Amino acid sequence: MPRLIKKVGSLRRGKRGVPKGVIHIQASFNNTIVTVTDVRGQAVSWSSAGACGSRGTKKSTPFAAQTAAENAIRMLIDQGGMEQAEIIMKGPGPGRDTASRAIRKSGVVLSFVRDITPMPHNGCRPPKKRRV
């Protein structure tokens, strides 16, 4: 028999905080996106380096990733919400470590950090050799 999951009110409406959640960091070479979800996967807040005001090549810097991580969890801290979180990182970008350091400094207790970067198992066939 399936267990019933109690419905949690949305933080966007300001009803209540989320005591435990998951912080997703997607770090590409061009941008860093930080999404905070509850345990069920419902997005609570998000931020990106581009949304924080960085434009062009400055979006791919570690400082922009740090700013994005701080903005994503600032709303949760203001609501008195998240006490414990898990970090799931994806991508090879330069801002992944800086974003996780910013989250660690915010006071949220981290249970674990997981890296789910997709790795090819031999990948696509390369293009044929160039003959000059």
UniProtKB/Swiss-Prot annotation:
Keywords of this entry: Chloroplast, Plastid, Ribonucleoprotein, Ribosomal protein, RNA-binding, rRNA-binding
Family: Belongs to the universal ribosomal protein uS11 family.
Protein name, UniProt field: Small ribosomal subunit protein uS11c
Compartments where found: Plastid, Chloroplast
Source organism phylogeny: Eukaryota, Viridiplantae, Streptophyta, Embryophyta, Tracheophyta
Transmembrane segments: none
Entry-linked HAMAP family: Ribosomal_uS11
Molecular function (Gene Ontology), one example: structural constituent of ribosome
Entries under InterPro entries matching the protein: Ribosomal_uS11, Ribosomal_uS11_bac-type, Ribosomal_uS11_sf
Keyword Transport in record: no
UniProt keyword annotation of Chloroplast present: yes
Signal sequence annotation: none
Subunit description: Part of the 30S ribosomal subunit.
Any one Gene Ontology cellular component term annotated for this protein: ribonucleoprotein complex
GO terms for biological process, alphabetical: translation
Pfam families: Ribosomal_S11 (PF00411)
